[in-house]
């Protein structure tokens, strides 16, 4: 049976441990007296802590390689499952802050004070507790094949959305302003109701 790729990788990882076996073999020779000249292998036998440090480094490298392989496999499976579901278009929220050239403090105050929201518009609360039921995953992923829109495209999309929202608010408020005010009590609508 031929060794597989994992067996070959295991053998390659064990190659740095080969000098450790020579150190233990050299320490088995007890004929060397400390006063005599000892062969180089026997000198290494007194440095057992070096082998322990090398073994610890090897184990950390092995753990790192294993963790990165597991992470790579999990991310690949995750992007593979996401590619089967069609991505629905989701609107982008963006903030455009105008910058004046007068001074940084003035431009900051001006940009924040010049933003006026309609009364019916719900402001995003950035510092509140997120509701797990309404949380939506981010629109763009780092592993997606397409890039997010550029800054200019986001600004155009926001302006287009504001322009669409602005006329609809104006048309809703116009009929209320054109209705005549009644001076008497409440009138019941019906065929006999007269309009001045």
UniProtKB/Swiss-Prot annotation:
Q: Where are the transmembrane segments?
A: 47-67
* Keyword hit for Electron transport: no
Q: Which domain of life is it from?
A: Eukaryota
User: What subcellular compartments does it reside in?
Assistant: Membrane
Sorted alphabetically, the Gene Ontology cellular component annotations on this record are: membrane
- Pfam families, sorted: TMEM52
Q: Per the record, which residues fall in region Disordered? A: 162-196
Alphabetically list the UniProt keywords: Membrane, Signal, Transmembrane, Transmembrane helix
State if Transmembrane is listed as a keyword.
Answer: yes
InterPro entries assigned to the protein according to its UniProt record, in alphabetical order: TMEM52 (IPR038942)
In the UniProt record, the signal sequence range is 1-28
- Record's bilayer topology term: Single-pass membrane protein
Q: What is this protein called?
A: Transmembrane protein 52
Organism (species): Mus musculus
Gene for this protein?
Tmem52
């Amino acid at each position: 049976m031929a060794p597989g790729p994992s067996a070959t990788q295991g053998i390659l990882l064990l190659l740095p441990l080969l000098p450790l076996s020579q150190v233990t073999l050299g320490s088995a020779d007890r004929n060397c007296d400390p006063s005599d000249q000892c062969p180089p292998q026997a000198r290494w036998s007194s440095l057992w802590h070096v082998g322990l440090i090398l073994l610890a480094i090897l184990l950390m490298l092995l753990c790192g390689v294993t963790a990165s392989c597991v992470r790579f496999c999990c991310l690949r499976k995750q992007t593979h499952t996401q590619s089967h579901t069609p991505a629905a278009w989701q609107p982008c929220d963006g903030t455009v802050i105008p910058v004046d050239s007068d001074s940084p403090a003035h431009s900051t105050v001006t940009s924040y004070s010049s933003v006026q929201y309609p009364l019916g518009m719900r402001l995003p609360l950035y510092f509140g507790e997120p509701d797990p039921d309404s949380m939506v995953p981010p629109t763009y992923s780092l592993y997606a094949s397409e890039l997010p829109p550029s800054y200019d495209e986001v600004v155009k999309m926001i302006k287009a959305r504001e322009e669409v929202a602005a006329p609809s608010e104006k048309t809703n408020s116009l009929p209320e302003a054109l209705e005549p005010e009644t001076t008497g009590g409440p009138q019941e609508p019906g065929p006999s109701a007269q309009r001045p």
